[in-house]
């Protein structure tokens, strides 16, 4: 409420606070660089400025991490690097202290469209079936995904892992094809057992699967691989097969539904409306190739007992550009996604080569640039790398999103009365003219604010926190992460 913001802003003054400033400038002169100059909070208020009011009393979701998908293609490139070069780039990306601290991994359960070829963990001769899963094997992933994931866990043992299938094994599908075709009803039970075997097999390799989504993009049958799945059938699968099998096996792996675009908030809600299915489901996952991010908030407000996850978005740039157009994706994918209740942000491909390979034919993504481009042992850091770094480095898992004034939001202006010194008056601002931002309180007691200046002019970022004020300037098209001690 406005009263709560006022009380927080007028709290008892404390010692001087210094703001650290990490910036990426559109002209590439600074790429997620800690600025040498610091700014201190003081009691000097700009009467004409609109302030971002920060109020840690009002807190929202707990963040679980920011990261990427370790696709089969990503792992294929990483495993081909020399061990020293691979260790160096993995340390840079995943070390929470000395690197940028990517803090969430999405794996593909079987192949995705960013593999050199398609496969499942139970591929058998055409025309045959394997209801006992005697041929189940992680053999393909053991060549690249598993060893790379093990190396990442050696750097950060606490990184959460979510896995998503693009398709069931071909012999389980009505079409008999890896592209499109629904899961056969008589294969629901064996497919649930297939999920269990995967989670258990990865656990034996030292990789704990924290969550699975039931199907990547269940409304897309044009990808290779892909498998369409409507909510009514997923309800049946969850409540009669997958949920009971996970329970029977004693797995603590979360079950996440939907895993597709923001244009269909009804999908997850349909599953939640069946209590026998909903009891097995932790939350729903979203992409943003269609629809509005507010769909996530809509689902959360309908079912606040269920979590929201953001699991995929391709974020690319042309190689060799003089500019880095970072403001828009940070505004949308870090600020927008977290303000709409997502507990994480996972962007798409971690790594590709200069040709954006590998990918499958007939639907595989030919323009899915990685967060990094790998050419032998040479590494190029791309747009998506810096988008996630602005959050992952400074907003560790366990951080809580807290209130900060959004553009166009109602706010409060606090200033000293002109005729009565040391007396304060407040004004209600109906539509605050502030840059896009989101703010977190970390477990270490830091306030972290991420700001995007998605405009062609310089913005003055005015911050009001705990009775003090600070002013920072942000260049056009630039992004900053500001950090200071909470009080």
Question: Where in the sequence are the language-model features?
Answer:
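Carbohydrate-binding surface patches
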Residues: 393, 398, 404-466, 477
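N-terminal catalytic cores of secreted or lumenal carbohydrate-active enzymes
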Residues: 31-209, 240
């Amino acid at each position: 409420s406005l009263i709560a913001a006022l009380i927080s802003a007028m709290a008892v003054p404390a010692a001087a606070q210094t703001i650290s400033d990490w910036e990426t400038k559109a002209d590439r002169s600074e790429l997620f660089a800690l600025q040498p100059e610091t700014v201190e909070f003081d009691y000097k208020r700009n009467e004409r400025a609109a302030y971002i009011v920060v109020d840690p009393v009002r807190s929202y979701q707990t963040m679980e991490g920011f990261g990427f998908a370790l696709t089969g293609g990503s792992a294929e490139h990483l495993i081909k690097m020399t061990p020293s070069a691979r260790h160096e780039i993995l340390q840079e990306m995943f070390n929470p202290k000395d690197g940028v601290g990517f803090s969430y991994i999405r794996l593909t359960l079987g192949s995705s469209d960013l593999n050199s070829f398609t496969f499942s963990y139970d591929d058998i001769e055409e025309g045959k079936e394997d209801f006992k899963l005697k041929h189940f094997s992680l053999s393909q992933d053991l060549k690249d995904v598993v060893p790379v994931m093990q190396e990442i866990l050696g750097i950060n043992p606490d990184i959460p892992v979510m896995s998503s299938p693009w398709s069931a094994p071909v012999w389980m599908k009505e079409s008999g094809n890896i592209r499109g075709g629904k899961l056969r009803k008589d294969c629901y039970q064996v497919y649930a057992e297939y999920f269990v075997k995967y989670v258990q097999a990865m656990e034996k390799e030292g990789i704990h699967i924290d969550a699975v989504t039931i199907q990547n993009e269940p409304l897309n049958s044009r990808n290779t691989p892909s498998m369409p799945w409507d909510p009514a059938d997923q309800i049946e699968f969850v409540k009669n097969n997958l949920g009971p099998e996970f329970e029977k096996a004693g797995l603590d792996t979360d079950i996440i539904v939907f895993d597709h675009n923001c244009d269909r908030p009804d999908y997850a809600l349909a599953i939640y409306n069946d209590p026998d299915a909903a009891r097995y489901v932790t939350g729903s996952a979203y992409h943003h190739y269609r629809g509005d991010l507010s769909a996530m908030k809509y689902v959360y407000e309908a079912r606040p007992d269920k979590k929201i996850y953001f699991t995929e978005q391709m974020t690319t740039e042309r190689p060799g550009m003089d500019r880095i157009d970072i403001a828009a994706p940070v505004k949308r994918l870090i600020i927008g996604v977290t303000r709409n209740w997502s507990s994480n942000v996972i962007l798409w491909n971690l790594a590709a080569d200069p040709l954006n390979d590998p990918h499958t034919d007939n639907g595989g993504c030919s323009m899915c640039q990685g967060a990094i481009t790998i050419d032998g042992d040479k590494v190029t850091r791309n747009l998506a790398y810096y988008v996630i770094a602005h959050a992952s480095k400074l907003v560790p898992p366990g951080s809580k999103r807290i209130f900060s004034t959004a553009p166009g939001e109602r706010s409060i202006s606090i200033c000293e009365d002109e005729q009565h010194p040391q007396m304060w008056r407040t004004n209600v601002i109906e539509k605050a003219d502030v840059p896009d931002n989101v703010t977190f309180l970390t477990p270490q007691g830091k306030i972290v604010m991420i700001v995007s200046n998605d405009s062609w002019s310089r913005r003055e970022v005015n911050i009001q926190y705990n009775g003090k004020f600070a002013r920072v300037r942000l260049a056009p098209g630039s992004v900053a992460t500001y950090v200071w001690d909470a009080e």
